[in-house]
A protein has these predicted regions:
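A short, compositionally biased
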Residues: 19-22, 66-68, 139-143
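Short linear motifs in intrinsically disordered
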Residues: 13-18, 61-63, 134-139
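N-terminal ordered "arm"
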Residues: 1-43
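Aromatic- and glycine-enriched beta-alpha-beta binding-site module
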Residues: 26-28, 34-100
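Short, basic/low-complexity N-terminal boundary segments at the transition from targeting/disordered tails
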Residues: 1-5, 44-49, 53-54, 123-129
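Intrinsically disordered, low-complexity boundary segments flanking structured domains
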Residues: 12-13, 23-25, 57-59, 132-134, ...
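Short, well-structured alpha-helical interface segments that form or flank functional binding sites
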Residues: 20, 60-63, 125, 164
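A contiguous, surface-oriented mixed alpha/beta subdomain in the mid-to-C-terminal portion of proteins
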Residues: 72-224
Length: 224
């Protein structure tokens, strides 16, 4: 299934309240601070998708995945964009039961999909502005995720990522905090910090998926 081998999936600002319940929410880099939901570690396997390509019940499915097979092709300046479709999608067939067009017009289902993609693209642009705002205040920094397996005396760093620096966030001047609060950025920044508790759940999910014990939770798995 789509995104079955993805370790991370893009998410937008409006998805944070739902996505933070399942995934660590991080940024791709400081140069490209796109917001991502972590779905796996070490292996090219999405731990929320089963071997049949189905997402786990009750796990939040990011809009990036739900919009598929539709997507956006945009100019670099972002002034113009076109909604596109993946012609390699297995569900796209000649003479299928659900047509994309009727009488040279988009069907209601196609129009709904196009509207969803357009809304997603607008949300993505707002998310980019949020990330740039955090970058202006140097709040996106390289971080390490740690886990202490049973029997270990010290935590082990198992992932490097870019995320909100809590110390820098707390150290902002009152004036800057107030400015960020007015823009709704403070609450979202703390929501990203709260999502970091899901790193432990990601490792536990990996251990369960591959039958690993606490000591072997970092062990690489051979996959095709």
């Amino acid at each position: 299934g789509f995104a079955a081998k993805a370790r991370a999936v893009p998410v937008t600002l409006g998805e944070i309240p739902s996505a933070m319940k399942n995934y660590p929410l991080i940024f791709m880099s400081q140069e490209r601070p796109s917001l991502l939901a972590v779905t796996g570690v070490y292996d090219d396997i999405n731990l929320f998708v089963d071997d049949n390509g189905n997402w786990e019940d009750f796990a939040y499915i990011p809009a990036y995945v739900r919009r598929y097979p539709f997507g956006v092709a945009a100019e670099e300046n972002g002034e113009r964009m076109a909604v596109v479709i993946d012609r390699g999608y297995e569900g796209l067939t000649q003479g299928g039961q659900t047509p994309l067009f009727e009488n040279d017009q988009m069907t209601a289902q196609t129009q709904a999909a196009v509207d969803f993609v357009k809304n997603y693209e607008r949300d993505r642009q707002v998310t980019d502005q949020f990330a740039k705002l955090l970058m202006q205040h140097e709040l996106i920094q390289q971080q390490s995720a740690h886990y202490t397996p049973a029997g270990a005396s010290e935590p082990i760093a198992f992932a490097q990522y870019f995320g909100v620096d809590e110390d820098r966030l707390k150290g902002l001047s009152d004036e800057t905090k107030l400015e960020l609060e007015r823009q709704g950025a403070m609450a979202l920044a703390y929501a990203l910090l709260m999502s970091m508790g899901n790193w432990r759940l990601i490792l536990q999910r990996r251990a369960k998926r591959f039958g690993l014990n606490e000591q072997d939770v970092f062990k690489p798995i051979a996959t095709n």
